Curated annotation (Swiss-Prot):
GO terms for molecular function: bile acid binding; calcium ion binding; calcium-dependent phospholipase A2 activity; phospholipase A2 activity; phospholipid binding; signaling receptor binding. Binds 1 Ca(2+) ion per subunit. GO terms for biological process: cellular response to insulin stimulus; fatty acid biosynthetic process; intracellular signal transduction; leukotriene biosynthetic process; lipid catabolic process; neutrophil chemotaxis; neutrophil mediated immunity; phosphatidylcholine metabolic process. A lipid is attached at K78 (N6-palmitoyl lysine). This is Phospholipase A2, major isoenzyme. Its EC number is 3.1.1.4. Keywords: Autocatalytic cleavage, Calcium, Disulfide bond, Hydrolase, Lipid metabolism, Lipoprotein, Metal-binding, Palmitate, Phospholipid metabolism, Pyrrolidone carboxylic acid, Secreted, Signal, Zymogen. The active site is at H70, D121. Its cofactor is Ca(2+). It comes from Sus scrofa.
Length: 146
């Protein structure tokens, strides 16, 4: 399952599986911290092979690799003993963080699972902020290119 939460996961996915959208909303807010003026739902959902719901193939660019890395980070979170109570779903874990200018800091009071997931989201948001955005990869035909 592609990790990048944005549209589908914030609405349909969260409603269908009883997932707390708060944790997903935090990731959206982190992206907005790292990239002021961005619209994560519109900008990153359905970008490349990994940004959005699902993910497969070879990432098409640096931004898409950020999404693949985030997917893999959430996969790793599922395997952590400290995250087992989440019913193998890192999307349900909310955490504490702060944003100052474009600097994101995960709160040291987060438990081990919260800290891990917070850092997954933090690293992805920072990665997004540094990666070029290629409009031709938005709404990419994944069956053809991934």
């Amino acid at each position: 399952m592609k990790f990048l939460v944005l549209a589908v996961l914030l609405t349909v996915g969260a409603a269908q599986e009883g997932i707390s959208s708060r944790a997903l909303w935090q990731f959206r807010s982190m992206i907005k911290c790292a990239i002021p003026g961005s619209h994560p739902l519109m900008d990153f959902n359905n970008y490349g092979c990994y940004c959005g719901l699902g993910g497969s193939g070879t990432p098409v660019d640096e931004l898409d690799r950020c999404c693949e890395t985030h997917d893999n980070c959430y996969r790793d979170a599922k395997n952590l003993d400290s995250c087992k109570f989440l019913v193998d779903n890192p999307y349900t874990e909310s955490y504490s963080y702060s944003c100052s200018n474009t600097e994101i800091t995960c709160n040291s009071k987060n438990n081990a699972c919260e800290a891990f997931i917070c850092n997954c989201d933090r690293n992805a948001a920072i990665c997004f902020s540094k990666a070029p955005y290629n409009k031709e990869h938005k709404n990419l035909d994944t069956k053809k290119y991934c």
